[in-house]
């Protein structure tokens, strides 16, 4: 579990997110690969359907703690995602809660916030989502 901060200053906890699946999208606003991943996630039909149904919550998480950079990129994250940054002075990175070797980094979690896919990419995520979940979309 970790604390995140929203643009309006409110804080939340990962375990407070109520959805069947949670996708953690660790990014840097200046990273071209992060931009590409964000654009692909926003267009994948399965991801879009799951987000719209409320079964998937995407948490865009800027882990570097640079508030100015995060504020400047507020409009690049889709409105249907939680746009967050580290609310505890880089605790997520410092305490190594997630192995973020580089960005972008994607983690798919189940409803209990257990890791299903670790440090994956959007192609593997899409393949997994189209496996067990495709019949229920």
Task: Mark where each language-model region is.
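N-proximal helix/coil linker or "cap" segments that precede and/or mark the start of modular domains
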Residues: 1-5, 15-19, 47, 68, ...
């Amino acid at each position: 579990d970790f604390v995140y901060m929203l643009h309006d200053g409110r804080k939340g906890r990962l375990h407070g997110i109520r959805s069947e699946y949670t996708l953690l999208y660790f990014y840097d606003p200046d990273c071209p690969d992060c931009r590409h991943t964000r654009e692909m996630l926003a267009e994948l039909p399965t991801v879009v359907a799951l987000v719209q149904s409320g079964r998937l919550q995407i948490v865009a998480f800027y882990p570097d703690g640079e508030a100015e950079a995060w504020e400047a990129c507020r409009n690049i994250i889709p409105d249907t995602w939680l746009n967050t940054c580290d609310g505890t002075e880089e605790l997520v990175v410092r305490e190594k809660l997630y192995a973020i070797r580089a960005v972008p980094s994607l983690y798919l979690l189940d409803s209990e916030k257990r890791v299903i896919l670790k440090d994956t990419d959007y192609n593997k995520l899409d393949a997994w989502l189209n496996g067990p979940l495709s019949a229920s979309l």
